[in-house]
Amino acid sequence: MAANAEPQQTQPAKHSEVGHKSLLQSDALYQYILETSVYPREPESMKELREITAKHPWNLMTTSADEGQFLNMLLKLINAKNTMEIGVYTGYSLLATALALPDDGKILAMDINRENFEIGLPVIEKAGLAHKIDFREGPALPLLDQLVQDEKNHGTYDFIFVDADKDNYINYHKRLIDLVKVGGLIGYDNTLWNGSVVAPADAPLRKYVRYYRDFVLELNKALAVDPRVEICMLPVGDGITLCRRVS
């Protein structure tokens, strides 16, 4: 969920797990995935941070445990070393990334709220991973513009994960396409946006879901016709679209 988004209003949850964001129609099936595949193999540091984040009032902003596992595996498969994350919150996905990178791997992490990042920082430090993270507080676009202006940064990132303000996803993509290497990946989170991407125009949606829905739809349409990337939209968490740069 976006770093700038409102906290969700209290209502009966479809799943009991914090940050579930699952689009599966069966609670039992999602619980089966968590208990069979995710929780038994979840690193102790990720479990600790997940439980700490569960106590935060905006805990639905966190990356779900199954998506964290997916990202960790993906980064290992592509042998990622130099990465970027836009939208950090308490750092659950950041920790999943740091665990997957080699000891000299790097993550340029950006978020408008350092206070949230510092909730998870002690866990990251205890895991011996803080040296991999370069955290920058503030809006991402000005920093991205600085990076793009220097051509030595072009094509240097193996993986970039975006889980921030949906109304800027298109603006991020315009810049990130130059920074990710050919063959590298950009992952855009929440691209199914609570399932609202297929909801009727008059559907009763929460205010923040309705507000960001059009921006998510705009991104999805743009990625579908962008010849510079190959894409794969996956129903993991709240939907993640992987873009592999080909030119």
Swiss-Prot record:
Pfam family, one: Methyltransf_3
E.C. designation(s): 2.1.1.104
Reactions that this protein is recorded to catalyse: (E)-caffeoyl-CoA + S-adenosyl-L-methionine = (E)-feruloyl-CoA + S-adenosyl-L-homocysteine + H(+)
Amino acids binding S-adenosyl-L-methionine: 63, 85, 87-88, 93, 111, 140, 165
Cofactor dependence: a divalent metal cation
PROSITE patterns: SAM_OMT_I
Keyword Nucleotide-binding: no
Binding site residues for substrate: 21, 163, 194
Entry superkingdom: Eukaryota
Function: Methylates caffeoyl-CoA to feruloyl-CoA and 5-hydroxyferuloyl-CoA to sinapoyl-CoA. Plays a role in the synthesis of feruloylated polysaccharides. Involved in the reinforcement of the plant cell wall. Also involved in the responding to wounding or pathogen challenge by the increased formation of cell wall-bound ferulic acid polymers.
Protein name: Caffeoyl-CoA O-methyltransferase 2
Naturally occurring in which organism (per UniProt): Eucalyptus globulus
